[in-house]
Amino acid sequence: MYKFLVFSSVLVLFFAQASCQRFIQPTFRPPPTQRPIIRTARQAGQEPLWLYQGDNVPRAPSTADHPILPSKIDDVQLDPNRRYVRSVTNPENNEASIEHSHHTVDTGLDQPIESHRNTRDLRFLYPRGKLPVPTPPPFNPKPIYIDMGNRYRRHASDDQEELRQYNEHFLIPRDIFQE
């Protein structure tokens, strides 16, 4: 019985190796993903409403409005009664400052906003707008005529006439041998 078990286990191993099958081992399966949390207005009652609180005062939110975060981390110290367009520290990021700034290179454009990198204007090269895309001419192949050599004849008499013409041109006449 012991020999049979050893023989059968070796046979199973050889069979699995010969058939190139891999036995699927249990692997790590990630935990199921949680659905997104959708909160209702009842759950967000204690948190500040950032955009409109009923007083209709046009001001930007600041960290002082937040109940948990301390107001000391607001190191920029923005005025809450003023709305800022882009950046307070760098006025070059604002489009209004670009319009009023003086460019060193005049590119000849009507609006200086279009020339952020002093690029060339190519409108004078292509006045019509879009250029037509060149396309190759249509491919119309010429028909090829093959001389079939009168392969398809209507009557058998045509073959006899051709054979008679062949004999006249290429065969030796009989009267030469009769002398």
UniProtKB/Swiss-Prot annotation:
Protein name: Lebocin-1/2
Propeptide part(s) removed at maturation, as residue ranges: 17-120, 153-179
Assigned keywords, A-Z: Antibiotic, Antimicrobial, Glycoprotein, Immunity, Innate immunity, Secreted, Signal
Chain spans, region Disordered: 93-116
Lineage: Eukaryota, Metazoa, Ecdysozoa, Arthropoda, Hexapoda
Signal peptide interval: 1-16
Upregulation: By bacterial infection.
Expression sites (tissue/organ): Hemolymph. Produced in fat body.
Glycan-linked positions: 135
Modification after translation (UniProt): O-glycosylation is important for the antibacterial activity of lebocin, O-linked glycan structure is a disaccharide (Gal-GalNAc) in case of lebocin 1 and a monosaccharide (GalNAc) in case of lebocin 2.
UniProt subcellular location: Secreted
Biological process according to GO: defense response to bacterium; innate immune response
Organism whose genome encodes this protein: Bombyx mori (Silk moth)
Role: Antibacterial peptide.
Top-level lineage group: Eukaryota
GO cellular component: a single term: extracellular region
Family to which the UniProt record says this protein belongs: Belongs to the lebocin family.
